[in-house]
Amino acid sequence: MVNAPIKLLIAASGTGGHLFPAIALAEKLPDYEIEWLGVPNRLETQLVPKQYPLNTIAVEGFQQGLGISSLVILGKLIGSILKVRRLLKQGNFQGVVTTGGYIAGPAVIAARSLGLPVIFHESNALPGKVTRFFGPWCSVVALGFDVATKYLPRATSVCVGTPVRSQFLNLGNNSQLDLAIPGDVPVIVVFGGSQGAVAVNQLVRQAAPAWFEAGAYVVHLTGDRDPDVDSLKHPQYIELPFYDNMAALLQRANLAISRSGAGSLTELTVCGTPAILIPYPFAAEDHQSYNAEVFTKAGAALTFKQSDLTAELLQTQVLNLLQSPTELAKMGENAKAIAVPDSADKLATLVREVVER
């Protein structure tokens, strides 16, 4: 008699930082029957492969104070917990994995109320409030950065790194980079993660003319909410909302200018791409600054607060690095040194150990 496959529910929603690691994990568990838990009209409706049935619940974060809106949100939360509990029970699921965010609460509470194991993956150097609160409830918290351990004293935690998309696991082939860039010029890649970064985009457009004069090409991934798209025209300037083959692009890049979300940083390390980091100043608890600090201490990046950064300063810093190939190479080596390219395998092994024991 053939054993039925293990059923696993993955709760991941909202941004690429939550979704890409979860998708990478799912790809490493081909023998599992996996379903997805998300939120309607969020990025998961586009990114999650169709092979994983998508279940949705209505959930959002609490605002400051206890007004009518908070009571409405509380009502939605209770309803979501009951819906997830029913899904887990009727579907005979044997475990839950979550990558955090608002959706983690209902998933963790529902699973633990049924006695199911929960694996929580936290990508950031400073674990979020949801992770810190629910971490002790979980079977184990898998960490992207070892430094995060100190913020979770009551949780069982292990550092596995942050899984990257499968395209980053087959490096060494740049033939898929279908952009009109000569092979012998420096390339600067600018990106703000899955949500873009309008303030960074503005600084880059002001600073870029001097980089063009230095012979550099700029590949600028603006996101889809930039009001100034098409405001800069130059033969060495390639502007796109997104680019599918980030692995090939980051491998080709001499330098990246980026926010410091955990997912983006993980991709930089796997590709060995040196970076100038500009943490998103409105991130919850300024957690992107904690991520950037890990890279700065490792010598893999330069970090600037958005409030301190002018177009002139950014222009100068980039030119200095382009004129110092030895320093850029060292930064790239330092980035590689903190990479965990087999993170998805490590997390999959951990999931198997917890769910199958």
Swiss-Prot record:
MF annotations from Gene Ontology: UDP-N-acetyl-D-glucosamine:N-acetylmuramoyl-L-alanyl-D-glutamyl-meso-2,6-diaminopimelyl-D-alanyl-D-alanine-diphosphoundecaprenol 4-beta-N-acetylglucosaminlytransferase activity; undecaprenyldiphospho-muramoylpentapeptide beta-N-acetylglucosaminyltransferase activity
Cell compartment(s), UniProt: Cell inner membrane
GO biological process terms, semicolon-separated: carbohydrate metabolic process; cell division; cell wall organization; lipid glycosylation; peptidoglycan biosynthetic process; regulation of cell shape
Keyword presence, Cell cycle: yes
CDD domains reported for this sequence: GT28_MurG
Entry's EC annotation: 2.4.1.227
Single GO cellular component term: plasma membrane
Keyword Cell inner membrane: yes
UniProt pathway annotation: Cell wall biogenesis; peptidoglycan biosynthesis
Enzyme class name: transferase
Positions that bind UDP-N-acetyl-alpha-D-glucosamine: 15-17, 124, 165, 194, 288
Keywords: Cell cycle, Cell division, Cell inner membrane, Cell membrane, Cell shape, Cell wall biogenesis/degradation, Glycosyltransferase, Membrane, Peptidoglycan synthesis, Transferase
Highest taxon listed in the record's lineage: Bacteria
Role noted for this protein: Cell wall formation. Catalyzes the transfer of a GlcNAc subunit on undecaprenyl-pyrophosphoryl-MurNAc-pentapeptide (lipid intermediate I) to form undecaprenyl-pyrophosphoryl-MurNAc-(pentapeptide)GlcNAc (lipid intermediate II).
Protein name: UDP-N-acetylglucosamine--N-acetylmuramyl-(pentapeptide) pyrophosphoryl-undecaprenol N-acetylglucosamine transferase
Native organism: Nostoc sp. (strain PCC 7120 / SAG 25.82 / UTEX 2576)
Lineage of the organism: Bacteria, Bacillati, Cyanobacteriota, Cyanophyceae, Nostocales
